[in-house]
Amino acid sequence: MLRAGVIIVQQFLSRIMDLLCACPPGHVPCLAVTGAGGKSSLAAGLSIHLSKAGHSGIIAPSTRIYMPRPRSCSPEEAQRLAECGIQTCDALLLRRGRSDRALSEELRAVLCTMDGVPRRLLPLPEKSSALCPNRALCLVLGEEVVRHSPRSKLRGLSPETICRLKQFLEKEKLSRRAVLLVEADGAARHPLKAHAAHEPQIPSCADLVVAVMGLDALGKPLATVVHRPELAAERLGVTLYAPVTPRMAATLLLHEEGPFRGTPSSARRIVLLNKTDVLDPSQGKLLDELLESLHVPGGPDEILLHGNNA
């Protein structure tokens, strides 16, 4: 039996959009995404949905992420890139050691520019004239660009800076809703992870925290599909080459030092189980076992499923 109070939803983007847009007028929702196996795809997909709904999405990672691409392609191409976890946005704003207020003022100027910004990914001037917002934008904020092979990375902002940006935006009373999307940890493209002592970097102002797991981790050796496998093996009390079971995955997702560590008490906690389409019919029981293992005291408020067959 499923635990009362847990909602299982398959249309995950629509559900998250509903939760974000249910916030009162003037409130700037903040979503933090943690875990592995689809964080970047979630952020990219949400930014597209926000734009379609007339809202401005502000990607403000608190960790390093791959550099997004300019939103100069067609909506169809942007959607395809999002499904690959590649973010496309209108502009990049870098803090580069400046004060939080300076970054906030630049952000306000961009959000309130009548003609929007050029559809190219370049740091904007530190000073811009403030007019009225005319269209929804997707912006990316970060500290600095770090050269990295094969793709450069963007070093994120501190959780404290992100919360100060949120407070600043709420005082501005923008005519379009702005939503902060925070990628709060990295997983080196693995579908599951064990979190180190400094992770995740969840802002104290987060309204929603979504912990992501890729279901393609189930049944495979821990050493090959888990980010920081040694740490995971230690926490689980298994060998490095033990196959990942549903109970093991649930233990990592709900561990006190796992993806929800540092979540504000007022925030809604959501688990997103990604890639349901990778499970063949004979593995359907694995998903059922994982859902049951997540339905425990202290478990998530909601479980969302995603995959081409969901």
Language-model features, listed with the residues they occupy:
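Walker A (P-loop) phosphate-binding motif
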Residues: 13-53
